[in-house]
Amino acid sequence: MAEVSSSTVRRPFHRRRKTCPFSGANAPKIDYKDVRLLQRYISERGKIVPSRITAVSQKKQRELAKAIKRARFLGLLPYVVA
């Protein structure tokens, strides 16, 4: 059998998990009227960016999605960007 030397074995790279931008003392409140904040979590095509990319917690992602949908309904944000 072939022996694997320790110099050729690569250890997997572990990326440090980013913290949620909406948790903490100075965190912004999620509000459907704050269009500038909501636009940071919408893609160029108008889709809601998933939490695995933005590092938003599951609870705050639900709040964010609800606020974006409410702002779209009221005409503050577009549904689709052509």
Curated annotation (Swiss-Prot):
Tree of life domain: Bacteria
InterPro entries per the UniProt record, alphabetical: Ribosomal_bS18, Ribosomal_bS18_CS, Ribosomal_bS18_sf
Pfam families on file: Ribosomal_S18
Keywords, ordered alphabetically: Ribonucleoprotein, Ribosomal protein, RNA-binding, rRNA-binding
Chain intervals for the UniProt region annotation (Disordered): 1-20
One GO term of the biological process aspect: translation
GO molecular function, one term: structural constituent of ribosome
Keyword Cell membrane belongs to the record: no
Record-linked SUPFAM superfamilies: Ribosomal protein S18
Cellular component annotations (GO), alphabetically ordered: cytosolic small ribosomal subunit
Keyword presence, Repeat: no
Function per UniProt: Binds as a heterodimer with protein bS6 to the central domain of the 16S rRNA, where it helps stabilize the platform of the 30S subunit.
Family of the protein in this entry: Belongs to the bacterial ribosomal protein bS18 family.
Subunit (UniProt): Part of the 30S ribosomal subunit. Forms a tight heterodimer with protein bS6.
HAMAP family, A to Z: Ribosomal_bS18 (MF_00270)
Record-given protein name: Small ribosomal subunit protein bS18
Organism (species): Allorhizobium ampelinum (strain ATCC BAA-846 / DSM 112012 / S4)
